[in-house]
A protein has these predicted regions:
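Conserved mixed alpha/beta catalytic, RNA-binding, or beta-rich assembly cores of soluble enzyme
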Residues: 66, 87-118
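A structural signal for small-residue-enriched, beta-sheet-centric alpha/beta enzyme cores
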Residues: 80, 98-102, 112, 116, ...
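Glycine- and acidic-rich phosphate- and metal-coordinating loops
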Residues: 37-39, 69, 79-95
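Single conserved hydrophobic/aromatic residue that forms the stacking wall/gate
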Residues: 1-7, 11
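Active-site cofactor/substrate anionic-group-binding motifs, chiefly glycine-
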Residues: 15-52, 62-63, 67
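Ordered, amphipathic secondary-structure segments that act as subunit-interaction surfaces
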Residues: 46-84
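Conserved alpha/beta core surface patches that mediate binding of polyanionic ligands
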Residues: 17, 24, 65-74, 82, ...
Length: 182
């Protein structure tokens, strides 16, 4: 039987759900490991201009989905979740800049809550997270260093940088772009 359960939380303008399955992908069968992945989407009405659902199939959503999944797996002992697959869905209700970093932060919280509940129910022997994860966007706007860029600042930034860090401030992921001279 396929165990399917969802935990939901809303962080500011993002809805994060965690779905659990008692199956792992075929390539992980007989490996003594579970799996953890993520999917990211912006709802059609989340920005000033409606976003077509067809655009969600494009590269940006997939790239952000992979970023979220990699960030979570970087601090997860997949051996502890052996036999389970977890899918974290990050849906943006209102886009205001910083959606990927907010989604990473919310995804870690939702998944940590899920793991804690499963430990309390004796479905996991311990929480598989080895440490906390946090993400932040930073940039240079008008020559000034700015943290947590909103849409207006992000669209005018000379440098836009997303950092994913663990609780020891070790860098797990870095993404950056520059307009003109960085």
């Amino acid at each position: 039987s396929n165990l399917r359960r969802q935990r939901q939380m809303c962080i500011r303008d993002r809805l994060i759900t965690v779905s659990i399955s008692d199956r792992v992908p075929g390539w992980l069968e007989n490996s003594d490991k579970g799996w953890l992945t993520a999917e990211y989407n912006m709802l059609p009405g989340s920005s000033d201009q409606r976003i077509s659902r067809k655009s969600f199939e494009g590269g940006r959503s997939k790239e952000i989905s992979r970023l979220i999944g990699r960030s979570l797996r970087a601090v997860c002992n997949l051996g502890i979740i052996n036999g389970y697959s977890f899918t974290v869905d990050c849906d943006v209700l209102e886009a205001d800049g910083g959606t990927r970093t907010a989604s990473i932060n919310g995804a870690w919280i939702a998944l940590n809550d899920t793991f804690t509940k499963m430990v309390n129910e004796n479905k996991l022997v311990q929480n598989p997270f080895t440490c906390k994860v946090g993400a932040i966007s930073v940039g240079i706007v008008g020559g000034e260093l700015v943290a947590d860029l909103d849409y207006a600042k992000d669209s005018n930034a000379e440098v836009d940088l997303n950092l994913v860090l663990d609780e020891k401030f070790e860098i797990l992921e870095i993404q950056g772009t520059a307009e003109g001279k960085p």
